[in-house]
Amino acid sequence: MSQLDKVQAWVSDHKLDVAYISNFESIKYLTGFGSDPIERVLALFVFPDHEPFLFAPALEVEAIKDTGWNHPVYGYLDHEKPFQLIAKYIRERNANPIHWGIENNNLTFDRYEVLRSEFPNAKFEQNLTPVFEKFRMIKTADEIEKLNAAGAEADYAFEVGFNAVAAGKTEADVAAELEYALKKRGVMEMSFDTLIQVGAHAAEPHGATGMNQIQNNELVLFDLGTIHDGYISDASRTVALGTLNDKQKDIYKVCLEAQLTAQAYAKPGITAASLDKVARDIIDKAGYGEYFIHRLGHGMGMGEHEFPSIMEGNDLILQEGMCFSIEPGIYIPGVAGVRIEDCVHITKDGCLPFTHTSKELRYL
């Protein structure tokens, strides 16, 4: 049964007349067609007992057909009113759809209002956002194969990036060199902006690559990822240029112990919260707890941040096929930042990483 078939069965089981799917990641997951329509309307409509259809800007129609989509696709031109056309195509299948499912976390209020004006009797009673979060949380063998391929691309990027590090270069220089090497290799898209941070700049976990010059005797943090056939990689390594002082070495040692211990602990049957605690306890015991300022990990797949969330308070039981990051970090303002990250998938008795670049402290 395809993912689209599963959604159609869910729609039928929950007595809905129609499911309106508006999140472009959900659409890609169900149809194989990926596009961010920006201000235009891209939508998938699924019915319990009628064929689904895609509604898209006219300029996307041929690309949709090229994916192998074998159900109706309707295009619209920029001067047309998309929701009037959508209403027409829905009524061809159901003259008066009452029970609707929508993605609450994605559908904008203005589009919701237009939809209500077209279907004044509609009851938008099912939030599809958690439904798709649950569907996407367990990966298939095919999805894991794509994630492994993306991980191999990230490993290559690390090697290029490490070799590019030199005193006097900027963070941006290193990012540009590794991304250029990836493009020459046929990797056209990063999963997020490559992050290179040197020295104290790395103590800003959501900072950005900049023009900071790399100096000797500093730590350099890499956080990067690629997109392979719609699936992402995401990994972090921290390396040393020159000689480190005892504080820098200790921060790295503690962070590495937390990451390795958590990765060894990850398996089916434990809770997300307990996995976070394993890493956090190590960092707390070493005296750096106040500097570990984010959750241990986030789900990943087609999106950079999916479910599950590996954090305190999340009692979700880990299951085979779940994919997420394990990324403890220690960020001491004005001193240094260290983060070590692999994304993993849960197997029947443990977990396996998508990236394999060594996590032992590397001196360049």
Where do the PLM segments sit?
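Active-site neighborhoods and metal-handling regions in enzymes and metal-associated proteins
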Residues: 1-364
